[in-house]
Amino acid sequence: MSALFNFRSLLQVILLLICSCSYVHGQWPSLLDRYKNHEVLGAFWKMARVGERASPYVSLACILMAISQFNS
C-alpha cells in the first residue's frame, strides 16, 4: 500500500525525512541553506529546522516508531 493512504507509513516517511534533513544540515549546512527561500526545495530546509529545534520529540517519535515496527 502506498504511504499516502496508510497513516502509519506516512508518519514513518515524514520522520525519516526530518531525521535525514537534520543530519544533512548538520554535516553540510550550505547544501540546504542555499535553497532556504525556494518553493519546493525549501521544504527540506524546514524539515531540518524542525529536526533541530524539536530534536528530543523527534528522537522519541523515532524510537516509538521503531518499537512499533518490531512489534508488528
From Swiss-Prot:
It is found in: Endoplasmic reticulum membrane; Golgi apparatus membrane. Disruption phenotype: Inviable. The keyword Lipid biosynthesis does not apply. Residues 27-53 are lumenal. The chain crosses the membrane at residues 54-72. One of its GO terms (cellular component) is Golgi membrane. GO terms for biological process: intracellular transport; protein secretion. It is a single-pass type I membrane protein. 'Kish' means small in Hungarian. Belongs to the KISH family. This is Protein Kish. It comes from Saccharomyces cerevisiae (strain ATCC 204508 / S288c) (Baker's yeast). The gene is KSH1.
